């Protein structure tokens, strides 16, 4: 069980690794045009939109990246299966689809289905499709169906399985969503103490790699917190749709302390300190190690 959780944790690193790229593009864009946020500069607008494209589509990236990361041979067919799984679930469980399938007005559809496009669902789709790939990517079908044998069969079986999963989620997703919201808001409403608890949980789960699952609740719009999105959004809109229970206790960026700002800049200072204080006879070795480590930390957050 422990080794499998570590495997999922490693797979989660694939989509998480793109976050620094988004941060760099957004940061440079806002630096170029700090007042207009892209309105006064085509280059700034280009960079801001490019960075936002990554953040806005993190659920899809989780589905594709986790499926790819879990596949035994890191094949693109697994990534395609992850995308297929995500599209099926988010389409079947959208507010309009649930309204039509259940025969009820959209106003009566549970609010949880309006938040089906989130990182939790992306991770779930990625895990399921990745495991389906590992099980079926070498399957041999009868000769008249031979074209669909092997890896081509994976997206097909994924489609069937995700229809069943969607049916199950129709009844349990509101409860799961409610639990995620309760978990996130219960910690977030504690203010700085809650941020400390979140940091503790994050460090506690690092050995199995599941700290990324906890991060998704606070960094993205799973439970309404969306710390990264609020930080990079327009200042006047930072608290616009904040859950009422968090008013006065949440501050934008409080769940980024110790993370990407430190990974991208603080650790570079630490690397420089190592170089400056190294013995002359070892300096060349230390420089090569620290430059590689600092470069990796800045670009990937690892």
Residue ranges and their predicted role:
Residues 58, 242-302:
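Alpha-helical membrane segments and immediately flanking helix-loop junctions
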Residues 53-58, 116-120, 150-156, 187-197, ...:
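Membrane-interfacial loop-to-helix junctions in multi-pass transporters
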Residues 2-143, 147-148:
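Early transmembrane hairpin of solute transport permeases
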Residues 128-144, 160, 168-180, 212-216, ...:
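Juxtamembrane interface elements at the cytosolic ends of transmembrane helices
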Residues 36, 89-100, 157, 190-197, ...:
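Juxtamembrane membrane-interface segments at transmembrane alpha-helix termini
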Residues 173-231:
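Aromatic-rich transmembrane-lumenal/periplasmic boundary elements in polytopic membrane proteins
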Residues 96-107, 196-202, 235-237:
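A cytosolic-side transmembrane-helix exit/cap motif
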Residues 221-254:
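Interfacial juxtamembrane loops and adjacent helix segments
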């Amino acid at each position: 069980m422990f080794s499998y959780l570590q495997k999922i944790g490693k797979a989660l690193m694939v989509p998480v690794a793109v976050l620094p790229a988004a941060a760099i593009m957004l940061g440079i864009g806002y630096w170029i045009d700090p007042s207009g946020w892209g309105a006064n500069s085509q280059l700034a607008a280009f960079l801001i939109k490019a960075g936002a494209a990554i953040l806005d589509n993190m659920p899809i990236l989780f589905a594709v990246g986790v499926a790819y990361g879990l596949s035994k041979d890191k094949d693109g067919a697994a990534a395609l299966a992850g995308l297929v799984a995500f599209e099926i679930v988010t389409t079947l469980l959208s507010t309009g689809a649930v309204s039509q399938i259940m025969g009820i007005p959209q106003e009566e559809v549970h609010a949880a289905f309006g938040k089906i496009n989130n990182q939790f669902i992306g991770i779930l789709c990625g895990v399921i499709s990745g495991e389906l790939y590992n099980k079926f990517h070498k399957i041999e079908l009868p000769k008249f169906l031979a074209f669909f044998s092997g890896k081509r069969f994976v997206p097909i079986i994924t489609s069937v399985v995700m229809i069943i999963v969607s049916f199950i989620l129709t009844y349990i997703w509101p409860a799961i969503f409610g639990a995620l919201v309760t978990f996130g808001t219960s910690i977030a409403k504690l203010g700085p103490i809650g941020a400390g608890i979140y940091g503790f949980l994050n460090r506690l789960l690092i050995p199995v790699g599941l700290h990324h699952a906890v991060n998704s609740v606070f960094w993205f719009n799973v439970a309404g917190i969306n710390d990264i999105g609020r930080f990079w959004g327009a200042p006047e809109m930072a608290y616009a749709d904040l859950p009422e229970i968090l008013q006065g206790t949440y501050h934008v960026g409080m769940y980024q302390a110790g993370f990407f700002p430190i990974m991208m800049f603080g650790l570079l200072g630490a690397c420089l300190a190592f170089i400056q204080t190294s013995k002359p006879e070892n300096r060349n070795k230390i420089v090569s190690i620290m430059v590689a480590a600092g470069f990796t930390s800045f670009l990937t957050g690892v």
